[in-house]
Amino acid sequence: GNVVNVSLREDSEALEEVVVIGYGTVKKSDLTGAVGSVQMKDVSQVGITSADRALQGQIAGVQVNARTGQPGEAMMIRVRGSNSLAGGNEPLYVIDGMPVEKMNSDINPEDILSMEVLKDASSTAIYGSRGANGVVMITTKRGSTGDTVLEYNGYVGVSSLRKKLDLLGKNDYIAMVNEVSQNDGTGIAITPEQAALLPNNDWQDLAYQTALTHSHQVSVSGGTDKTKLYSSLNYMNQEGIIKGSNYNRFALRINGDQKLAKNLSLNASIAYSYGTQNTANSSADGWGAIAYTAMVMAPIQEIKDADGKYTNFSGTPWGGTNPVGMAELYKNKAVNSRLLANMSLMYDIIDGLTFRVNAGAEVNAGSSDRYIPIGLSAGGKLNGDASKSKSNYYTLINENILTYDKKFNKNHALNLMGGITFQTYQY
């Protein structure tokens, strides 16, 4: 037989990579806990619309699934499965050292440098019970020493229904209806003359669309030995494959680093995002889910009646709302704005001994408006249906951390850390 000699090359560069862990960093070669890392430069070419999608298929033991597939919807992330039947299973999210309430689609993925997922008890223990479901560490881009760089990043993509269901067309549907009528002894239900006047609607074509997604970002970065700055402005628009659904996001970020003295430095970040989400009715509970009614509406059903009103289907015990009317008239709009601001002051007391003070704030404001008019069967049952809600919350956090990190020789090093955290939450 043939002999194949294979020589593996050591990837020393990967071992020297710095991984972000709780309240610090460590070289990958020195890492002992279960931590998965994603460099955004490796996934940015895919054209992801939100930060959480960057984790899909990238880290072992981390499940990232869509909830309903609506544009702008936050993904469901599970680190090594679900740990609680009654409590929450979402991991803790930490952006540039600041724990945040939740991961929304309003976090601009173009601003992210890397993401680390802390998976085991030794890695998440420093966060206590908050880290019981894992911790997702997000590090954003910062300025570097050198010339000022003005950069534009953008992409355009399309999405469409992968495969339509093979449903009956007009002729096959009429043949089936007549066969059922004859078997019942009632004769032909639809004559050829009547059939000639009936439409042949493909409700899947009428309910779904080829959706366009586009994102545009302008960023400026650069700095000197003492001052470094990164700023970005982003706009993203994502259409859903169901007509009437879409998501728009506007995001602004400014990250700055300043060397105040030989042993004193300041880091600051501020990020603002504003998102608008219009969702299609996706529930299958009799309220007229578009995906459901596009399957059960008869191809010979008119889109509108003689009065110009949308028709509704009553050919099943559950009924059905016209999917075209639902896409046009159903309104479910959510607006969310979020402000994240944090600042870190670091003082090198002696060689290896550093004291750091962090202060941060998260302010979130959201509103939701839902309306089903009386012209749709789902709304007609209630003589129309409308709801409105608002939610506002803020988080303030202060951390005081003392770290001693000393490397004595090639084989011996010592790292000690102690601190106290104060956090308040108002809903």
Please place each PLM-identified region on the residue numbering.
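Extracellular and analogous surface-interaction loops
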Residues: 347
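Short, small/polar-rich motifs associated with maturation and membrane association
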Residues: 1-273, 282-284, 340-341
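Surface-exposed loop/interface segments of Gram-negative outer-membrane beta-barrel transport/assembly proteins
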Residues: 145-200, 210, 240-247, 251-338, ...
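An active-site-proximal structural segment forming one wall of the substrate-binding cleft
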Residues: 353
